[in-house]
Regions:
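Metal-dependent de-N-acetylase/amidase catalytic core
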Residues: 75-82, 86-206
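Active-site rim/loop-helix segments in enzyme catalytic domains that contact anionic ligands
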Residues: 1-103, 131, 138
Length: 206
């Protein structure tokens, strides 16, 4: 998990900075009797939760791109004018470029091309994150006066997980399955086949 990776890096004294595209305003609410009562401040609640979680992990720097949560694919939230899914590509990339130049990371991470399980904002993080990785050193597209001094991170890693391992875990959790569910488990629309994963980290101690 990225949480384990962040905790490990922080424990080793590595400076870790997190950039989050949205505050999760369109997320699901499962632990309230009256979800509508907190819906209007869900972004505020989730930001507080994230800051508390990062403090436990030892991460000191958190920045937001300040877009709105786009909701799950195919929901009305996708059409919101302020949703990250609808963000101007160069504008969003520029916001991240400015933060890369501010924090000057050696390694960047972003979601895989399919956004893990297909969330619109995760897909957009892949697009914008990959573009910003290359754009951070590009003064032609992102001039110094507006975005700061150029910087080129050494590595960009796309975060994903083993589809085969995910299938095994899901089958173990669900026990006996019918034929239709078995087919769904065999070809889930998430993760990557193991042969395409080039970097693995064991974060079990964290």
């Amino acid at each position: 998990s990225m949480g384990g990776t962040l905790a490990e890096l922080a424990d080793r004294g590595v400076a870790v900075s997190i950039v989050t595209a949205t505050r999760g305003e369109a997320g699901e609410i499962h632990n309230r009797d009256d979800a509508d009562a907190v819906r209007h401040r869900l972004g505020e609640i989730r930001e507080a939760e994230q800051r508390a979680a990062l403090a436990v992990l030892g991460v000191q720097h958190l920045e937001y791109l300040d877009y709105r949560d786009s909701g799950m694919m195919g929901t009305p939230e996708n059409a919101h004018l302020e949703a990250f899914w609808n963000a101007d590509y160069m504008e969003a990339t520029g916001r991240l470029v400015a933060l890369i130049r501010k924090y000057r990371p050696e390694v960047m991470t972003a979601y895989d091309p399919f956004g893990g399980y297909g969330h619109p904002d995760h897909i957009q993080v892949h697009r914008v994150g990959t573009a910003a990785f290359f754009g951070a050193a590009d003064l032609g597209r992102f001039p110094r006066a507006r975005f700061g001094a150029p910087w080129q991170p050494d590595h960009l890693l796309w975060s994903s997980w083993s589809r085969e391992r995910s299938i095994g875990v899901r089958k173990a959790m669900r026990g006996e399955t019918n034929e239709e569910l078995e087919e769904e488990l065999d070809e889930p629309a998430s993760g990557f086949l193991s042969r395409f994963l080039s970097v693995r980290r064991d974060v079990a101690p964290y």
